[in-house]
Amino acid sequence: MARWAPEETDTMAAIAAEAIAQVGTNRTVIGVDGQDGTDLERVAAALVTGFEQHGISAMAAAAPSADQDRLRSDLVTPFRTSGAGDGVLIVHGRGILAHGVRTLWRWSLWVEQESGRLERRADVKIAASAVLDVTDPEHPRREWNDAC
Protein backbone atom coordinates (compact mmCIF):
# COMPACT_ATOMS: atom_id res chain seq x y z
CA MET A 1 0.00 0.00 0.00
CA ALA A 2 1.31 3.43 -0.94
CA ARG A 3 1.90 5.89 1.87
CA TRP A 4 0.58 9.41 1.68
CA ALA A 5 3.17 12.14 1.40
CA PRO A 6 2.67 15.89 1.10
CA GLU A 7 3.02 17.49 -2.32
CA GLU A 8 6.05 19.62 -3.10
CA THR A 9 4.03 22.85 -2.83
CA ASP A 10 2.81 21.95 0.66
CA THR A 11 6.26 20.97 1.90
CA MET A 12 7.87 24.12 0.53
CA ALA A 13 5.13 26.35 1.98
CA ALA A 14 5.78 24.73 5.37
CA ILE A 15 9.53 25.29 5.04
CA ALA A 16 8.90 28.92 4.04
CA ALA A 17 6.68 29.34 7.11
CA GLU A 18 9.48 27.93 9.26
CA ALA A 19 11.98 30.42 7.83
CA ILE A 20 9.52 33.30 8.24
CA ALA A 21 9.00 32.40 11.90
CA GLN A 22 12.73 32.04 12.59
CA VAL A 23 14.31 34.95 10.71
CA GLY A 24 11.58 37.14 9.26
CA THR A 25 11.38 38.51 5.74
CA ASN A 26 12.98 41.96 5.83
CA ARG A 27 15.51 41.62 2.96
CA THR A 28 16.28 38.08 4.09
CA VAL A 29 18.83 36.04 2.14
CA ILE A 30 18.58 32.24 2.23
CA GLY A 31 21.22 29.79 1.01
CA VAL A 32 20.31 26.46 -0.61
CA ASP A 33 23.08 23.88 -1.06
CA GLY A 34 23.00 20.14 -1.51
CA GLN A 35 24.67 16.94 -2.48
CA ASP A 36 25.63 16.23 -6.09
CA GLY A 37 22.69 15.06 -8.17
CA THR A 38 20.08 17.20 -6.43
CA ASP A 39 18.24 19.85 -8.45
CA LEU A 40 18.94 22.96 -6.39
CA GLU A 41 17.34 25.24 -8.98
CA ARG A 42 14.05 23.33 -8.69
CA VAL A 43 14.17 23.46 -4.89
CA ALA A 44 14.87 27.21 -4.92
CA ALA A 45 12.02 27.86 -7.36
CA ALA A 46 9.64 25.78 -5.25
CA LEU A 47 10.73 27.68 -2.14
CA VAL A 48 10.01 30.99 -3.93
CA THR A 49 6.49 29.67 -4.55
CA GLY A 50 6.27 28.68 -0.88
CA PHE A 51 7.06 32.23 0.23
CA GLU A 52 4.60 33.66 -2.29
CA GLN A 53 1.87 31.45 -0.81
CA HIS A 54 2.45 33.41 2.41
CA GLY A 55 2.21 36.73 0.58
CA ILE A 56 5.97 37.37 0.67
CA SER A 57 7.84 38.60 -2.39
CA ALA A 58 10.70 36.20 -3.16
CA MET A 59 13.15 35.47 -5.95
CA ALA A 60 15.85 32.90 -6.65
CA ALA A 61 19.36 33.42 -7.98
CA ALA A 62 22.09 30.96 -8.93
CA ALA A 63 25.33 31.48 -7.03
CA PRO A 64 28.04 32.64 -9.46
CA SER A 65 30.59 30.78 -7.33
CA ALA A 66 31.13 29.63 -3.76
CA ASP A 67 33.47 32.55 -3.07
CA GLN A 68 32.21 34.58 -0.11
CA ASP A 69 33.41 37.96 -1.38
CA ARG A 70 31.89 37.44 -4.82
CA LEU A 71 28.58 36.22 -3.39
CA ARG A 72 28.44 39.23 -1.10
CA SER A 73 29.25 41.76 -3.84
CA ASP A 74 27.22 40.18 -6.67
CA LEU A 75 24.09 39.06 -4.81
CA VAL A 76 23.77 39.73 -1.09
CA THR A 77 24.71 43.42 -0.84
CA PRO A 78 22.72 44.54 -3.92
CA PHE A 79 19.63 42.71 -2.68
CA ARG A 80 19.83 44.07 0.85
CA THR A 81 20.49 47.66 -0.24
CA SER A 82 18.29 48.00 -3.33
CA GLY A 83 14.87 47.55 -1.81
CA ALA A 84 12.84 48.30 1.25
CA GLY A 85 10.50 46.19 3.29
CA ASP A 86 9.73 42.53 3.00
CA GLY A 87 11.53 40.41 0.46
CA VAL A 88 13.45 37.15 0.32
CA LEU A 89 16.34 36.20 -1.96
CA ILE A 90 17.04 32.48 -2.27
CA VAL A 91 20.58 31.80 -3.49
CA HIS A 92 21.28 28.26 -4.69
CA GLY A 93 24.55 26.59 -5.55
CA ARG A 94 27.07 23.94 -4.61
CA GLY A 95 29.41 24.80 -1.77
CA ILE A 96 27.54 27.84 -0.47
CA LEU A 97 27.07 26.26 2.97
CA ALA A 98 30.80 25.61 3.30
CA HIS A 99 32.64 26.99 6.31
CA GLY A 100 33.42 30.66 5.72
CA VAL A 101 30.55 31.15 3.27
CA ARG A 102 27.57 30.07 5.35
CA THR A 103 27.66 33.26 7.42
CA LEU A 104 26.14 35.15 4.46
CA TRP A 105 22.76 33.47 4.93
CA ARG A 106 20.18 34.32 7.58
CA TRP A 107 18.64 30.88 7.02
CA SER A 108 19.81 27.88 5.00
CA LEU A 109 18.61 24.61 3.51
CA TRP A 110 20.65 21.47 2.80
CA VAL A 111 19.16 19.26 0.05
CA GLU A 112 19.89 15.55 -0.28
CA GLN A 113 18.51 12.28 -1.56
CA GLU A 114 18.69 8.68 -0.40
CA SER A 115 21.74 7.69 -2.45
CA GLY A 116 24.83 9.43 -1.14
CA ARG A 117 23.14 10.86 1.96
CA LEU A 118 25.59 12.54 4.34
CA GLU A 119 26.06 11.35 7.89
CA ARG A 120 23.62 12.90 10.33
CA ARG A 121 26.34 14.94 12.04
CA ALA A 122 28.19 16.04 8.88
CA ASP A 123 29.42 19.61 9.31
CA VAL A 124 27.39 21.09 6.46
CA LYS A 125 24.17 19.43 7.68
CA ILE A 126 24.71 20.67 11.22
CA ALA A 127 25.19 24.20 9.88
CA ALA A 128 21.97 24.15 7.82
CA SER A 129 18.80 25.57 9.33
CA ALA A 130 16.84 22.71 7.73
CA VAL A 131 17.44 19.53 5.73
CA LEU A 132 15.25 18.49 2.79
CA ASP A 133 15.13 14.96 1.33
CA VAL A 134 14.27 15.05 -2.39
CA THR A 135 14.56 11.33 -3.10
CA ASP A 136 11.00 11.74 -4.47
CA PRO A 137 11.06 15.28 -5.94
CA GLU A 138 7.26 15.42 -6.21
CA HIS A 139 7.01 14.67 -2.47
CA PRO A 140 10.09 16.11 -0.73
CA ARG A 141 10.36 15.59 3.01
CA ARG A 142 11.64 17.91 5.71
CA GLU A 143 14.21 15.95 7.70
CA TRP A 144 14.96 16.63 11.34
CA ASN A 145 18.73 16.47 11.77
CA ASP A 146 18.69 16.16 15.52
CA ALA A 147 20.61 13.80 17.74
CA CYS A 148 17.62 12.39 19.62
Q: Each PLM stretch: what is its role?
A:
Residues M1, A19-A21, V32:
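N-terminal membrane-targeting/anchoring modules of bacterial envelope and secretion proteins
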Residues M1-T9, V29, G95-I96, V101-C148:
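Conserved NTP phosphate-binding and transfer environment spanning the P-loop NTPase/kinase superfamily
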Residues R3-W4, H54-G100:
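Conserved nucleotide-sensing/catalytic segment adjacent to the nucleotide-binding pocket
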Residues T9-G24:
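Pre-Walker A adenine-sensing motif
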Residues V23-T25, T81-D86, R102-T103, K125-I126:
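Flexible, charged surface loops at secondary-structure boundaries
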Residues R27-G31, G87-I90:
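Residue-level preference for the first positions of well-ordered beta-strands
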Residues I30-T49:
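Glycine-rich phosphate-binding P-loop
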Residues D33-G37, A63-S65, H92-R94, E112-Q113, ...:
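Structural motif
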